[in-house]
Curated annotation (Swiss-Prot):
This is Large ribosomal subunit protein bL28. GO terms for cellular component: cytosolic large ribosomal subunit. Pfam families: Ribosomal_L28 (PF00830). It comes from Pectobacterium atrosepticum (strain SCRI 1043 / ATCC BAA-672) (Erwinia carotovora subsp. atroseptica). InterPro entries: Ribosomal_bL28 (IPR026569), Ribosomal_bL28/bL31-like_sf (IPR034704), Ribosomal_bL28_bact-type (IPR001383), Ribosomal_bL28_sf (IPR037147). GO terms for biological process: translation.
């Protein structure tokens, strides 16, 4: 399973660790992902999505039905 938020599309990005001496070593910044079940009132069922913390805030703001409609138009499975 890839580390990608289904709502926002956030994915890992590359960067550097910096020591006290400012030596650079490569690292990955991972999104804050959680598998979360959301109740969809229109369908009378739970839907499990892999979302970031920001994605949960988007769902709280827009509503799960609107977000699922966006996922359907993008052709994503959920």
């Amino acid at each position: 399973m890839s580390r990608v938020c289904q709502v926002t599309g956030k994915r890992p990005v590359a960067g550097n660790n910096r020591s006290h001496a400012l030596n650079a070593t490569k690292r990955r910044f991972l999104p804050n992902l959680h598998s979360h079940r959301f109740w969809v009132e229109g369908e009378k069922r739970f839907v499990t999505l892999r979302v970031s913390a920001k994605g949960m805030r988007v769902i709280d703001k827009k509503g799960i039905e609107t977000v699922l409609a966006d996922l359907r138009t993008r052709g994503e499975k959920y």
